[in-house]
Amino acid sequence: MSLRIYNTLSRAMEDFSPLEPGHVRMYVCGMTIYDLCHIGHARMMMAFDVVQRWLRSSGLRVTYVRNITDIDDKIIRRAVERGITIRQLTDEMTAAMHEDIGALAIEPPTVEPRATEYVPQMLSLIGTLERKGLAYRAGSGDVNYAVRRFEGYGKLSGKSLDELRAGERVAVQDDKQDPLDFVLWKAAKPGEPPEAKWDSPFGTGRPGWHIECSAMSCATLGESFDIHGGGADLQFPHHENEIAQSEGATGKPLARFWMHNGFVRVDNEKMSKSLGNFFTIREVLQQVDAETLRFFIVRTHYRSPLNYSDVHLQDARASLKRLYTALALVAPEDIGAIDWADPHAARFKAAMDEDFGTPEAVAVLFELAGEVNRTRSARLAGLLKALGGCLGLLQGDPQAFLRQGVQLDAAEIAARIAARAAAKAARDFAEADRIRNDLLAQGIVLKDSPAGTTWEAAQ
């Protein structure tokens, strides 16, 4: 196939073909569910939603695994703060996550494993690492990974152990042989809830974060698979540690391709709660509709930084409106399977085949919209809708999208349009203008054409 992907591991563009012909296996690190999803989470899940959509559009079968971390220090603290069980908290936050990302048309993964369901596999993996001399039991009761014993440590980051130590300013701990060593099994501490503890050959405790993903990816996809993805913030140490664990245990490459989406910034500043510029998906959806937020994210390449601002959101809304305006002109023809030999479709495919180049693909959608405006072609409108569908866009009713935000009842608007038509027929143009201006003041734009008068929201 013609698809090329930027591989973080090699720091280069590479031709992609799946290990198993026709079948792509992809693992993405999902949410640690102690709070509502924010726009950074939306960006990550949207990026890999587009990836799996395009792989399927290219005729490939995709097994997409996106995990849920449902045991973690933050989860334990939040459950204690709220006076509820860990399971109550994680069930509540999982349901909220599904609701939020469902609104954004993010398709569910093929498999969504919860960490707490795979503790036996984690214990087995830790046992293998200990037998191979890659793990040791610390005086605290923890089991740690010995990074200096894994020859390839640092290959994803492209840095030596010394560079990683200096860059991360890792604190020296008495029970670690190296400051970069990380915990595989955390010994239970006094006062922790019973549901945060498991009996094990290493003592009562719970798994470390990194071992969770190694165990879940192996259990659901096998020892080696095609794509491992996540946010850029996970490249080190999380993904570096996953490689050390999985490859240390199996002796096989964990993933052929490593993909990382860029950070979200807010008004050109880092997004953080301390700066007061931290927004949940639900907060953003109080300002704009879900498809506008999706379009805002998708039109930026997944590896580039995404700058969130009210201005950029409104620009995205206006741009998406242009595409829906074209689809409102003529009923799109159901074209069935996309003909990739069509010049527009071919340019779209070329863009997406170059590391999922959504900015260039979106540009093709605007080219098509221009052609639909010019020709009123139902076939081209159908192609515009079909190509938009590859990105999870343009599947709604155009008139409904264009009329969002209008408070006036549709029947009342129709009555006023009829009154305006009667005024024009009676050559009472002052009254006709008054009706138009009155509707405009209420956020309604009238559009006259030989076929009659239609309306849409002004914004």
From Swiss-Prot:
Please name the GO terms of the biological process aspect recorded for this protein, alphabetically.
cysteinyl-tRNA aminoacylation
Q: Where is this motif: 'KMSKS' region?
A: 270-274
Keywords from UniProt, A to Z, are: Aminoacyl-tRNA synthetase, ATP-binding, Cytoplasm, Ligase, Metal-binding, Nucleotide-binding, Protein biosynthesis, Zinc
Q: What is the protein's major site of localization?
A: cytoplasm
| Disulfide bonding pattern of the chain | none
- Report the residue ranges where the short sequence motif 'HIGH' region is annotated in this entry: 31-41
> So what does this thing catalyse?
tRNA(Cys) + L-cysteine + ATP = L-cysteinyl-tRNA(Cys) + AMP + diphosphate
NCBIfam families given in the database record:
cysS
Full protein name: Cysteine--tRNA ligase
* Species classification: Bacteria, Pseudomonadati, Pseudomonadota, Betaproteobacteria, Burkholderiales
